[in-house]
């Protein structure tokens, strides 16, 4: 009888173990199978009244006049808050012109509904300082909103941060007309928001628009939440060049949720460094544990892009999103002058319309081996696209070289209407199709 009871207990323990295993398998996990921390499940908005005293800029020498640049007075407000232990810098209703602003520890930015923090269109209002741009740690023009080494920095409110980028765009296209091979840095342009070496950052509800260059750039940051932002720049009648919505650059633990992005470049770009020895440079690095969910993408060059200034991206999860006018859903830029590894990237539960479903090709713009004799290799591994219902022009937009290696791709539960439905299975080693229908035909 004793042995019988022991047998029953053993069976129950095995059963419980299997149930727990199934429970873990059904929980939210990153593409590599690791459990998503509860931090990602918390999308509670910050109440700015709990962040300290409010410092309305109009109480500290700033006038409600949209025609004059008031950088000094606004910066003085930030500095006053810092001297008093911190607080929230408030942009009230009205339009306030400014050059580069530098936030200090324990200071925050809040733009009320009807308030506009508008960037100056004079590049001299953006000081040249140590910075990070296009995968390089160099001196460059400051952004409109700058935060360096500020843990807990927040931007809140239902107002607008406007880059006032029109003259910068015109200057860029004029230069490109004069020299079609000009680089993106030949025309001096400021970013809208640059956040560097800041942890526990949260941006919520704000509208970022009309940036002169990248709309928001996060470099060497951990634990960043970007919630319910609207990020826009025009693609017609004039194109706003290089106005990426969100650039993630050597960051870990990033949640992008509930955002609308429509820009004349990539919506979300994963960066991290470029060049033949980029992986040896301590200022470069990987992006890990990035979740993009419940977002909508209007016009953009790609909804999600790895590269081109990127060396290692891992555990990237994009889900439950709608794309209405993206040129590409997923773009893996294989840069032949940079060692790259893109791994454990999952795109799932997507609806809408794009030009190219998946786009993988060498990115040769400004190619430079800088004297390196051998070409570094680029790898993409464990890429999954599933539960997707899309209309597109091109289903399988891929071309690789001998220096690119694609392995372990899975396409599952895909329903595609495509003008060009051709595909070449030999491009990828370890390619799996599960219930993939293109123009009503099952692909195996």
Annotate each language-model stretch with its function.
Residues 2-5, 12-90, 95-197, 202-204, ...:
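Extracellular "leader-to-stem" segments immediately downstream of a signal peptide or signal-anchor
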Residues 113-114, 151-160, 199-210, 222-235, ...:
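Right-handed parallel beta-helix
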